[in-house]
Structure formats: structure tokens, C-alpha cells
Amino acid sequence: MPRYSKWIRVVLLVLMPLLLPLVAAGQGLLPSADGQECLYNVRIEMEKGGMTGVCMMLRDSTGLHGSVVNEFGVGLMSFSYTFGSDKVRLHSVFGKMDKWYIRRTLRRDLRRLLHAMGDGEATYRNDRRGIGYSFIPITEDETSR
């Protein structure tokens, strides 16, 4: 086995620079350039119910700023994510969800969801709390209708 590991390392070192641009292209679901906006269909599912809506995220030089609005136009939450400190800050949360323990869970889950979206995954599930998050990008075709 050790004899093959040298060859595997050599092959990986040769192919990695060639494959990295292909893997990185188009995988992230987050806005990639400063000033870019992205829209997402949002679904938050819990055992006793769920919420759906739309999220708009804007990227600037420090991080991401987002706001989630439900189907009736009521703001569920607005947040910001700072790249340097890798932290999510909740600016406002819907009244019935504005409890310290819910805010803490939302903050942690949004951070993990944003990491997953950067890796190309549109969903995140908090198995401990039984909460599922889904942020599906809205394409240009859907918004022009």
C-alpha cells in the first residue's frame, strides 16, 4: 500500500491545479462579487410547522447582508454575516421568534447554512432541534414573469 501512495500523491499534485477551476466554477450559491444581489426561495421546516418566503442577499466588501420576508410581506428576519470574524448578526427577528434561545439557534444555523451554500449545498438540517433550512436560488427566468 505505501508503494501506491507515492503515485497517488504525484497524480493528485499534477491534476489538482487543472481540476480546481472546474470544481470551483459555479459551485457556490452565495453572491460572489461586491454589490451583487441574489434571491432565494426560503423554506424553514420544524416539527410543528414551517415558514416559506423569499430571501434577498447582498454582498459588500465586509460580508453578506440578508433579509427574509414571508409570502405575505411580513419580515421574518434580517441578518448580516462578516467574512473576517465568521459571525452572523441578527438585526431583527419576527416578534414571536424574538426569544434569546431562538435567536441563538438561528444565528448558529444561519452560519452553518451560509457555509454550506458556499460549498454549493442549498439545504441545512439541524438534527438536534429538528429544523430544516432550504435556500433555493431564484433564476432570472422566474423573476421576469
Q: What function would you assign to each model-found segment?
A:
Residues 2-12:
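Bacterial N-terminal signal peptides that target proteins for export
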Residues 22-26, 33, 51, 61, ...:
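Intrinsically disordered, low-complexity segments enriched in small/polar residues
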Residues 10-21:
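Bacterial N-terminal signal peptides
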Residues 34-41, 61-67, 119-124:
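Short, hydrophobic/aromatic-rich segments at coil-to-beta transitions
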Residues 46-61, 65-68, 73:
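Structural recognition of beta-strand segments within beta-rich domains
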Residues 2-4, 19-25:
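Extended interaction regions within the primary functional domain
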Residues 25-29, 41-47, 56, 74, ...:
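Mature, soluble, non-transmembrane domains
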